[in-house]
């Protein structure tokens, strides 16, 4: 998608030197064809499964990129009310949006419930109770999954590890069953699944396989 022509770098046949003269520099230039290709690689690999691929807006919240993924049928993984609003603005259906992240505030929880998103990934018992309270106040049901810490050595950079028992994210795997039982007894909570995030910069599926087991 990127190539040199007459010693000038091009992106999808667009001369980036000429583009810089129009928009100024520095600037960001993204190839929609590359985005489409990478998305297709994922969906094709799991075409036999009932799978929803969600683009993580924290990776890049450029509105045009979100719209590109929306046009491909992608869902969205968001970590703030701002990202949630950007996903909705890009016409990603609410039932394809997952709200992850720590420290969700009351306004974010209420907005997510009102917009009937796919699920809220719950980080702690206190957050679960907060979601339940707000859902009851709205007379609505809040779909949730629990972020479970599987105590897995993912193999990435230790400083960005999120899946070991000493890491401060999620609910420990030893407590998970009890918290799921608690959630099942809350009238305004609907359990939709389980959430696991073990880290970044992982280049094999080994750690993911271990966490699933």
Regions found by a protein language model. Name each.
Residues 56, 143-149, 195-197:
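Short beta-strand segments
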Residues 1-142, 181, 185-191:
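A charged N-terminal "starter" segment
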Residues 62-65, 83-85, 105-108, 150-165, ...:
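Conserved radical SAM core fold
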Residues 11, 29-30, 59, 154, ...:
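Generic structural "secondary-structure junction" signal
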Residues 127-183:
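Conserved anion-binding
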């Amino acid at each position: 998608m990127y190539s040199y022509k007459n010693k000038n770098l091009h992106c999808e046949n667009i001369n980036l030197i000429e583009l810089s003269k129009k928009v100024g520099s520095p600037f960001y230039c993204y190839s929609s064809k590359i985005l489409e290709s990478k998305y297709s690689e994922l969906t094709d690999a799991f075409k036999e499964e009932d799978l929803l691929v969600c683009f993580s807006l924290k990776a890049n919240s450029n509105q045009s990129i979100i719209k590109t993924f929306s046009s491909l049928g992608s869902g969205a993984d968001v970590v703030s009310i701002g990202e949630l609003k950007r996903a909705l603005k890009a016409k990603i259906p609410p039932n394809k949006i997952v709200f992850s992240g720590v420290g969700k505030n009351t306004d974010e929880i209420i907005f997510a419930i009102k917009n009937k998103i796919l699920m809220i990934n719950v980080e702690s018992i206190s957050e679960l109770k907060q979601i339940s309270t707000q859902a009851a106040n709205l007379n609505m049901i809040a779909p949730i999954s629990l972020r479970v810490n599987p105590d897995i050595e993912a193999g990435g950079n230790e400083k960005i590890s999120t899946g070991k028992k000493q890491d401060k994210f999620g609910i420990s795997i030893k407590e998970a069953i009890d918290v799921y039982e608690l959630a099942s007894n809350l009238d305004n909570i609907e359990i939709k699944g389980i959430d696991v995030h073990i880290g970044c910069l992982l280049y094999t599926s080994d750690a993911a396989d271990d966490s699933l087991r």
